[in-house]
From Swiss-Prot:
Example of a GO cellular component annotation carried by this entry: chloroplast thylakoid membrane
Lineage of source species: Eukaryota, Viridiplantae, Streptophyta, Embryophyta, Tracheophyta
Family: Belongs to the ATPase gamma chain family.
Membrane topology: Peripheral membrane protein
Disulphide-bonded residues: 240-246
GO terms of molecular function: proton-transporting ATP synthase activity, rotational mechanism
Subcellular location: Plastid, Chloroplast thylakoid membrane
PANTHER family in the cross-refs: ATP SYNTHASE GAMMA CHAIN, ATP SYNTHASE GAMMA CHAIN, CHLOROPLASTIC
Biased composition (Low complexity): 25-36
NCBIfam families: ATPsyn_F1gamma, PRK05621.1-2
Gene3D superfamilies from the UniProt entry: 3.40.1380.10, ATP synthase, gamma subunit, helix hairpin domain
Source organism per UniProt: Spinacia oleracea
PTM notes: Disulfide bond; Cys-240 and Cys-246 are known to form a disulfide bridge in the dark which gives rise to an inactive enzyme. Activation can be brought about by a ferredoxin-dependent reduction of the disulfide bond in the light.
Listed CDD domains: F1-ATPase_gamma
The protein, known as: ATP synthase gamma chain, chloroplastic
Length: 364
């Protein structure tokens, strides 16, 4: 009996360490399970969802890039094809206007008045996802408005484009004369509607100067917001306010256009150079004032149409560049997420193998 009792007690004491080890092993496994299986599974699902989302976004940005590339080619051709006519028309008008400066001729669109109020046309895009295209233009508009306020000159805005319309509607402190929505393809009819409003404002003397702020198309990777004096048409520049101060913008496009060797060039340091005389082949049977009156509406329409075309080409080029960068970034993000997914999946498999090995060792 004593031996039996001592043997039973020795067996019970023999099993105590094993029982302790087996009860301690599960907590280790239990602490490992939440950190591997549930959380890692959640991470894997999240990574899979993110990879799928990035793939879908990449498809969208790639498609938008291709669409913008197809459209910008047509817009670029319209800009390039329209520039010779517009520049030649401006050159002819400059020459005629300069000849008429010495004569007592009343041409409303060339009449230089003391500037009390300026109409600022702001040409923006209709859509977003084009990088900083619209923001850069609107910042330049705000800068020009601040300059006019500093000079003490009143102003009003003619907004063209849905993005600009939304921007100025949210700022009721900025006076806006009219809002115009842009189109996917600017036409002469659309430009004529804007020109009629500008013409009535200037001829009725509601404004004394009309400036046009738009984005000039330079190349597929570069576009510059520029200010262009639309009215009055004056090759001499230096349009002044009631105090005699020049109200022309420092980077005014029109008053930096001069002729050099018979071609229009841009001279920042010169307002005007000697203009060559008309070719002897050109002969005008009518009075120059009548011709100027007939050409000025065409000039107004062509300049507005050109600004709309250049703005559209710049917007499409900016969108193509932005979507190209977005596609590249999505591709890089997809690679990074795939690497993280593979690492998490490998860690999950390794953890499961370690659990199996630990369980097998515990059963031995």
């Amino acid at each position: 009996m004593a031996c039996s009792l001592s043997f039973s007690s020795s067996v019970s004491t023999f099993h105590l360490p094993t029982t302790t080890q087996s009860t301690q092993a599960p907590p280790n496994n239990a602490t490992t399970l939440p950190t591997t299986n549930p959380i890692q599974c959640a991470n894997l699902r999240e990574l899979r969802d993110r990879i799928g989302s990035v793939k879908n976004t990449q498809k969208i940005t790639e498609a938008m890039k291709l669409v913008a590339a197809a459209k910008v080619r047509r817009a670029q051709e319209a800009v390039v094809n329209g520039r010779p006519f517009s520049e030649t028309l401006v050159e002819v008008l400059y020459n005629m206007n300069e000849q008429l400066q010495t004569e007592d001729v009343d041409v409303p669109l060339t009449k230089i008045r003391t500037v009390k109020k300026v109409a600022l046309m702001v040409v923006t895009g209709d859509r977003g996802l084009c990088g900083g295209f619209n923001n850069m233009l609107l910042k330049k508009a705000e800068s020009r408005i601040a300059e006019l306020k500093k000079l003490g000159v009143d102003y009003t805005i003619i907004s063209i484009g849905k993005k600009g319309n939304t921007y100025f509607i949210r700022r009721p402190e900025i006076p806006v004369d009219r809002y115009f929505d842009g189109t996917n393809l600017p036409t002469a009819k659309e430009a004529q509607a804007i020109a009629d409003d500008v013409f009535s404002l200037f001829v009725s003397e509601e404004v004394d100067k009309v400036e046009m702020l738009y984005t000039k198309f330079v190349s597929l990777v570069k576009s510059d917001p520029v200010i262009h004096t639309l009215l009055p048409l004056s090759p001499k520049g230096e349009i002044c306010d009631i105090n005699g101060k020049c109200v022309d913008a420092a980077e005014d496009e029109l008053f930096r256009l001069t002729t050099k060797e018979g071609k229009l060039t841009v001279e920042r340091d010169m307002i005007k150079t000697e203009t060559p005389a008309f070719s002897p082949i050109l002969e005008f049977e009518q009075d120059p004032a009548q011709i100027l009156d007939a050409l000025l509406p065409l000039y107004l329409n062509s300049q507005i149409l050109r600004a709309l075309q250049e703005s559209l080409a710049s917007e499409l080029a900016a969108r193509m560049t932005a979507m190209s960068n977005a596609t590249d970034n999505a591709n890089e993000l997809k690679k990074t997420l795939s690497i993280n997914y593979n690492r998490a999946r490998q860690a999950k498999i390794t953890g499961e193998i370690l659990e199996i090995v630990a369980g097998a060792n515990a059963c031995v």
